[in-house]
Amino acid sequence: MKIQSIFAASFCLLSSISAHAAIQLTVPDEVELILVDNQEVKLESSFFSTTSTLDLENGKHQIVFRYNPVFKQGKDNIIVSSDIIVSTFSAEDKEISFKFPTYNSPEKAKAFNRDLNWELIDKNNNSIPFAQSQLIYNGMQVGRNIQFEVAKFNTTEHPAAFKEGMVTVTHKEIKNEQGDNTAEQMLHYWYEKADQATKERFLKSITNK
């Protein structure tokens, strides 16, 4: 009976582990992972490793990142930063990593913004399908509120838009990186998105205070 109980317990444990299996995303040093599902993330890495890892639940996810290859020129390190890329993919029980072209000079690496020829691959080198877009911002790059920009992007019908949890993230969890002006921007943005009845209720609530 004890042996049967041990086997039964082992089977339940294995079943539980299998049920909770997830995606492991490996992120190289040259990738600046800004947001995952419109949230900031903390990557796990060892001291001597040139990569970091992130565990995700099975299903659909959105990653927001920059590609920053580094080139040695004499005593200097030249960093070529891409535009911000928004990408959405779906996977289950996969070990996923980034794959980028090999560039031998900063000048050639600048072509990445035009070509966007990168991949997500599993451990067997199979490509993971994804949708992508560049998050272009024409104003001052310093102090950008990326979470706000991505939340706004996610209201569009672009294939890379991420609808899961969008409203919760937009209203409650966007960090105020630009002071009170960010709250004002969001207020104007969602007011314009509202229907006429909602606008009237909102204006009435302000008038009554």
Swiss-Prot record:
Tree of life domain: Bacteria
InterPro entries (alphabetical): UPF0319
Q: Which UniProt keywords apply?
A: Signal
Entry annotated with the keyword Coiled coil: no
Query: What is the annotated signal peptide range for this record?
Result: 1-21
Q: Which Pfam families match?
A: DUF2057 (PF09829)
Provide the transmembrane region boundaries.
Answer: none
Q: Which PANTHER family match?
A: UPF0319 PROTEIN YCCT (PTHR38108:SF1)
Query: What's the family?
Result: Belongs to the UPF0319 family.
* HAMAP family, per database record: UPF0319
Q: What is this protein called?
A: UPF0319 protein VF_1616
